[in-house]
């Protein structure tokens, strides 16, 4: 007896089409187009999860650099002075301080000023 793929195919298609919700036009409605677009989308999602970490680090460095420049210190010299002073604040915290609590950032900067040459 020949086995038909009715239930299996429907489940497989339903799974793909469920993941394709929110896509535009036929990429949402037609199985083959949805499958192709989903494959691309998953690749972009995988790549951009890695890229997001790099982007945020660049943003934090830019913000810290801007706050340092207001006090006449370069970013690289500030980070070097932090290492010499054994202050273990990460860039995310420093950037948040530079944006939201400039007085605290200036206090950290003042505490490492003597390490700068």
Swiss-Prot record:
The keyword Acetylation is annotated on this UniProt entry: no
GO molecular function: rRNA binding; structural constituent of ribosome
Pfam family, one: Ribosomal_L20
Keywords: Ribonucleoprotein, Ribosomal protein, RNA-binding, rRNA-binding
UniProt GO BP: ribosomal large subunit assembly; translation
Keyword Ribonucleoprotein: yes
GO cellular component: ribonucleoprotein complex; ribosome
CDD domains registered for this protein in UniProt: Ribosomal_L20
Family classification: Belongs to the bacterial ribosomal protein bL20 family.
Job of this protein: Binds directly to 23S ribosomal RNA and is necessary for the in vitro assembly process of the 50S ribosomal subunit. It is not involved in the protein synthesizing functions of that subunit.
Protein name: Large ribosomal subunit protein bL20
């Amino acid at each position: 007896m020949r086995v038909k793929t009715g239930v299996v195919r429907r489940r497989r298609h339903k799974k793909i089409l469920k993941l394709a919700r929110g896509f535009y036009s036929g990429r949402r409605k037609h199985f083959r187009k949805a499958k192709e677009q989903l494959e691309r989308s998953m690749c972009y999602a995988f790549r951009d999860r890695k890229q997001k970490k790099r982007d945020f680090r660049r943003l934090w460095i830019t913000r810290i650099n801007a706050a340092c420049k207001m006090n006449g210190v370069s970013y690289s010299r500030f980070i070097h002075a932090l290492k010499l002073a054994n202050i273990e604040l990460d860039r995310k915290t420093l950037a948040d301080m530079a944006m939201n609590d400039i007085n605290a950032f200036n206090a950290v900067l003042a505490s490492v000023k003597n390490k700068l040459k």
